[in-house]
């Protein structure tokens, strides 16, 4: 069973309600058809009901709940509650009402109020359009110092990682994390590997240097982050700084990082910044024909997940299933 199939089966075992703000978007509707037919999750589609049904011609979304924020009985309450959340930031009630007309803001309020268990959006919106309301409304989880993102990477015919399965982070949220933030990303990712994927994490803190082979402040950041992360979760195998080949290839690891508990065996790859992470996952996705599931957020008060605007309907199914499992 593939990793995504195991996630789908787990989602089915304890169904959650996921809200989709892009209710009339064609790929989203095709994904909704599949999710509902397979019993992966219960769905709420946001938008004009006629537009959604017209766009869904030939698909079966009869089991989905369709809510138009502009006509919803929840609108006034959500606007008032949003005003209470943001009044210290200078927002007025009128501005709150205008803001809640946005489907993503409305959907985040549904999650905040407990009407839905999670939210998936981003097929036609930029990441910032999702993260802004998520941070304002859903906020970070108790004790979380940072919100980050990860991709589950399934690489076909791959001898590395966990039989070709990896967790890559952070590939979508934090442009230039400092050492403490990078350590938090590593800790979150290790926990996600355990709880979501059932993997024993072996975390590689990636760099262009392996164990002092180069000297630079960027290397120092990764090295410091590694020590912080080790202190935070001493029972987890974390090592760095490691170049990618040393992290994955046993023969290279024996030369560059002998004795490392991670080198040559890594299944969780922590990139030093967003440029490296975003480029890295797309290289593997396109050149190795990997299945890239994500970006999935970690550290939020409830699961609110982004999509790539280049996503397929199958990608949306995968993210909905993953979001549902996060909500369990």
Swiss-Prot record:
Record carries keyword Cytoplasm: yes
Pathway listed: Metabolic intermediate biosynthesis; acetyl-CoA biosynthesis; acetyl-CoA from acetate: step 2/2
Keyword line: Acyltransferase, Cytoplasm, Transferase
InterPro entries reported for this sequence: P_Ac_Bu_trans, P_AcTrfase, P_AcTrfase_dom1, P_AcTrfase_dom2, Phos_Acetyltrans/Butyryltrans, PTA_PTB
Any Gene Ontology CC annotation: cytoplasm
Gene Ontology biological process terms from the UniProt entry: acetyl-CoA biosynthetic process
The keyword Acyltransferase is annotated on this UniProt entry: yes
Subcellular location: Cytoplasm
GO molecular function, one term: phosphate acetyltransferase activity
Name of the top EC class for this enzyme: transferase
EC annotation from Swiss-Prot or TrEMBL: 2.3.1.8
Disulfide bonds: none
Catalytic activity: acetyl-CoA + phosphate = acetyl phosphate + CoA
UniProt-listed PANTHER family: PHOSPHATE ACETYLTRANSFERASE
Database matches in NCBIfam families: PRK05632.1 (NF004167), PRK09653.1 (NF007233), pta (TIGR00651)
Family: Belongs to the phosphate acetyltransferase and butyryltransferase family.
Protein name stated in the entry: Phosphate acetyltransferase
Organism: Thermoanaerobacterium thermosaccharolyticum (strain ATCC 7956 / DSM 571 / NCIMB 9385 / NCA 3814 / NCTC 13789 / WDCM 00135 / 2032) (Clostridium thermosaccharolyticum)
